[in-house]
Amino acid sequence: MMELQVIRIFRLVVAFVLCLCIFIRSASSATKGFESIACCADSNYTDPKTTLTYTTDHIWFSDKRSCRQIPEILFSHRSNKNVRKFEIYEGKRCYNLPTVKDQVYLIRGIFPFDSLNSSFYVSIGVTELGELRSSRLEDLEIEGVFRATKDYIDFCLLKEDVNPFISQIELRPLPEEYLHGFGTSVLKLISRNNLGDTNDDIRFPDDQNDRIWKRKETSTPTSALPLSFNVSNVDLKDSVTPPLQVLQTALTHPERLEFVHDGLETDDYEYSVFLHFLELNGTVRAGQRVFDIYLNNEIKKEKFDVLAGGSKNSYTALNISANGSLNITLVKASGSEFGPLLNAYEILQARSWIEETNQKDLEVIQKMREELLLHNQENEALESWSGDPCMIFPWKGITCDDSTGSSIITKLDLSSNNLKGAIPSIVTKMTNLQILNLSHNQFDMLFPSFPPSSLLISLDLSYNDLSGWLPESIISLPHLKSLYFGCNPSMSDEDTTKLNSSLINTDYGRCKAKKPKFGQVFVIGAITSGSLLITLAVGILFFCRYRHKSITLEGFGKTYPMATNIIFSLPSKDDFFIKSVSVKPFTLEYIEQATEQYKTLIGEGGFGSVYRGTLDDGQEVAVKVRSSTSTQGTREFDNELNLLSAIQHENLVPLLGYCNEYDQQILVYPFMSNGSLLDRLYGEASKRKILDWPTRLSIALGAARGLAYLHTFPGRSVIHRDVKSSNILLDQSMCAKVADFGFSKYAPQEGDSYVSLEVRGTAGYLDPEYYKTQQLSEKSDVFSFGVVLLEIVSGREPLNIKRPRIEWSLVEWAKPYIRASKVDEIVDPGIKGGYHAEALWRVVEVALQCLEPYSTYRPCMVDIVRELEDALIIENNASEYMKSIDSLGGSNRYSIVMDKRALPSTTSTAESTITTQTLSHPQPR
């Protein structure tokens, strides 16, 4: 008897174990291919709602300093309480996720609310999926459907106005049917709706594909009727069909159902619409519920009957081209007994798949990065290498060219990156590489050889710790024109007779100047800088004591008063400051009262969040509160105050006051009622009223005068470092005021020991020479201002990856038209016919000069001011002349755009170094 009980218990245990194994296997099978990432999570965890396991993202990004906790008000429905915020000045950060080639996937990113009007872009591979713009206190989601082309996919965040951030990433396999007819496209989810339900969103485990079905109310003119039924014994054969939990509710109407989706992108896109049906009324038979389906009033399905195929459920996939809006309309067919019914629907926008970098180049550069990181952990340049090396933002030090539809790497510049170890031999497999610069590092082992088929034309190995002989395979490369390998202490330079006779530039392995040790540089630099600063300070004291208390800035025709009380201080070894005592200190309590406890957020800048406030005298102000993530201390803040308070000019936003209490660093400026130039050119304000050409020209001149004042600041030039249209503010009189000096620095002078400034700026405006060399000068501002001038002329953003690829960069798109004298092609359509051709040409040619790749060829801001003054005089004189013609009954001049060559010459207000009549090869300045 006892043995029988033991046998029964054993059988029960075995049955339980088998059931458990089957359940685990079933659950594992259901989530095969799922990737669930919780950014900045301390460890892996299981979400109690979905039972899915989320993995921390530390294997991609280990730096915990970029982690933030989501405010409690926002994370009630999220399993992950953290967010990763990438503090980058430009470029992208990507998550590399495993895929199976040719499998269709859904990828979803979840972004908690960060700040109002913050925006950045998201891409799948190098195909831009969309812009994320935060306008309400709620989470943002973006979802795309794609076919994997290899064994991984990059999910990338691209910086726009603010540092990008993310909380969760979810990758899920999907049925093939989703990409039917869109094989080479990425589908961006616009809407996925569960109709008639009033409960929470439905997702995994109810939906085995983990699609998230959100409840939606109808927008039909007359009330739609929710319909629900406890559905059972329904065979859902189609893999794209929603789960029964979604299909058991629906909306119906006796005559018509309509669902309106406004606010779509205004460019023409193809859309895929999935409509899902399940007949919930058991009394309805085939032929009794028949209706027509329209998309944007275009009939797509006539006399559609859910039950026609013999099944209770059905779905249909429809395609349509739309611009700005998409309406789904279901209309009862003639003779039908019942009105239309719809249980759920999905709308997806098709985006063309963009080819990534040449696969071989991609594999080589990724392997090279891995090898370099073995000896160079936490190297800033290598850590910034993320995603595709060429697209959308190229990696630092990499230059690419187009070749047969994909990008190839032609230049690799890793100079001055403090790299150690052996030079990765895999670099020799980059078959398209033409220029390789590895100078000024600490490499100690040379690669073995380059193949004879190499296209290399320039190689720089100088200033490293290489030893031995230069391989003959390098010396004899057929296309090599430049070779530098000097200043490697242990490398032989004796046998140079084998050098390729075709070499044009070489150092023959010799070191022209011995590289001084760091200690020597530091001591000599410190002594030189200290002596120079003391001399400058004493000189300025005597100069200001005897000089009349005002200065006149040449080219501006105006005298600007000096502060009556000034203080001289030497806060650092390489800067001196003139501090005005007119800036008012505010208490933190007063600031909180003026802003009503920081009630109205009006923007985000390089300094931090900006709030609107009102002082006791009624003056409206903009209050900038330094970001909590800033590492700036009290001393640095005081130095910045010294700079800001000393600058007084009608085209610069004045500093009214400051607060430095309880670790809070706050700056107070007057509020600019007309917003920024960006907003007036292509922001929300531009939709209300187009900025006319004379006003644009006046704004350009005002901004140029402000920058010229900074560059000619008494004693030492000040460089803005972040010139862009959003930093040019407009007061009530539309007078331009250059703003945001949080990044400003004094310019280097002769005698400075070295220049070591962190590269700052905004993508689309950044001077390529500054980015490459990290050597800052006034000409860096000039380049950025040239971009602003093109914005003013064209009304376009400096960088917009939503446009066709050839138009992503405003500068690269506009240059060919300007050089071909086809300026009309780039002019903002809103001002066409409303400008004088000669005035416009002056501005365009100044812009082109500003955008010279080499700073030597760019004009200074004072020259730019003179040219813009001339342009404004031409424009104003033409306007007055045409007004007199109009008063006599003549036609408006704006009906004709005059050809510039037919115009009489004008008298310049001052001799300028800018050539305005030709586009000949530039000369150094």
UniProtKB/Swiss-Prot annotation:
Residues annotated to bind ATP: 602-610, 624
Record field: transmembrane: 522-542
GO CC list: membrane
Keyword Ribosomal protein found: no
A Gene Ontology biological process term: nodulation
Enzyme class, spelled out: transferase
Coiled coil stretches, renumbered: 362-384
Keywords: ATP-binding, Coiled coil, Kinase, Leucine-rich repeat, Membrane, Nodulation, Nucleotide-binding, Repeat, Serine/threonine-protein kinase, Signal, Transferase, Transmembrane, Transmembrane helix
Active site (catalytic residues): 722
Catalytic activity: L-seryl-[protein] + ATP = O-phospho-L-seryl-[protein] + ADP + H(+); L-threonyl-[protein] + ATP = O-phospho-L-threonyl-[protein] + ADP + H(+)
GO molecular-function term, one example from the UniProt record: ATP binding
A Pfam family: Malectin_like
Domain of life from the UniProt record: Eukaryota
Occurrences of domain Protein kinase (ranges): 596-873
Tissue/organ expression: Expressed constitutively in the entire root system, except in root meristems.
Family in the record: Belongs to the protein kinase superfamily. Ser/Thr protein kinase family.
Role summary: Involved in the perception of symbiotic fungi and bacteria. Part of the perception/transduction system leading to nodulation or mycorrhizal infection. Phosphorylates PUB1.
Subunit organization: Binds to PUB1.
Protein name: Nodulation receptor kinase
Organism for this UniProt entry: Medicago truncatula
Taxonomic path: Eukaryota, Viridiplantae, Streptophyta, Embryophyta, Tracheophyta
Gene: NORK
